[in-house]
Amino acid sequence: MANRANRHAARTEDSDNTINYVQCDGLAVMKMVKHCHEESSNMDLAQGALLGLVVDKCLEITNCFPFPKSGDETMDEEMYQLTVMRRLRRVNVDHLHVGWYQSSDVGNSLSLALLESQYHYQTSIEESVVVVYDTQKSSRGFLCLKAYRLTPQAIQMYKDGDFTPEAFRTLKVGYESLFAEIPIVIKNSPLTNIMMSELNELLPEDKGHNFLDLGTATVLENQMRSLIERVDELYQEAVRYNKYQQVVFKQDTEKHRALAKLAAENAVRTSKGEPTVAEEEVIKQFRPMTAPNRLTATITSGQINTHAQHIAQFCSQSLAKLFITESLQNAKEAKETK
């Protein structure tokens, strides 16, 4: 994904006030939804480019198109994008590249690939965003479309290439401060709103109850399985980090012991009028340990937090569906008895 950004564009510094909100046309939303649902049937990750323009502090997304599948080795992805945007320009359609979109995996989109791709996009195209579409949640009747941008701290950390614990503490970066969510608004034309109102009136009464389905076993099972996997990964990261701390503590203890011994020997040499040995000779024997990369652990922590929130929210929605279904059933029975 990273190579899909315009590598030759001038890199600019990120700013907190670049984009205040994202306005997405209904046509672009429908194209993203259609693409994501088609790819979800094949268990593939749907990704595509967002086209539009920036007006004041608003990023307007007016069109989009899917990326070619990565399995096609004969396809030049950058040339494909340039060709599509060139042809859109010929028919007077917004062709400015303003970001990209992708579907989410079991309701959780935070990953190392997402972070790296958005870093390359945002340092090439300052106003770019990533729009994430949750196919599972949307299929249950809750349209889930979210826009994200990397925070300035995350960009600085990635630019430095330093993912040590000290770097995370210095920049005050955690899983909650890697991405900043940008409010997203869906805009339709007045004619589209009128048509939607008419279609809503034509919808049979029973069809509106499809989203009250209480079959939640599969969704909870997938969420719990993913949560357990992420907890296991975080445990392995914690074990590796604890081993690193133990090795560092042991090395520091040995170094202090060696320095104390050298100080005593130097005192004896000084009393005898002999030259002392520099401490650097002892310090050279203890090479500093390389700190482990904490980026993976941070991302895994964010995934665990997201899964926990989704499970809690899903359970609340299921309880609400239960009470709504009960009320509708009682009203239906009362209507039939009359």
Swiss-Prot record:
It is found in: Cytoplasm. GO terms for molecular function: metallopeptidase activity; translation initiation factor activity. One of its GO terms (biological process) is positive regulation of Notch signaling pathway. This is Eukaryotic translation initiation factor 3 subunit H. Belongs to the eIF-3 subunit H family. InterPro entries: eIF3h, eIF3h_C, JAMM/MPN+_dom, JAMM_MPN+_peptidase_M67A, MPN. Coiled coil: none annotated. Residues 22-154 form the MPN domain. Component of the eukaryotic translation initiation factor 3 (eIF-3) complex, which is involved in protein synthesis of a specialized repertoire of mRNAs and, together with other initiation factors, stimulates binding of mRNA and methionyl-tRNAi to the 40S ribosome. The eIF-3 complex specifically targets and initiates translation of a subset of mRNAs involved in cell proliferation. PROSITE patterns: MPN. The keyword Protein biosynthesis applies. Keywords: Cytoplasm, Initiation factor, Protein biosynthesis. The keyword Repressor does not apply. Component of the eukaryotic translation initiation factor 3 (eIF-3) complex. The eIF-3 complex interacts with pix. Interacts with mxt.
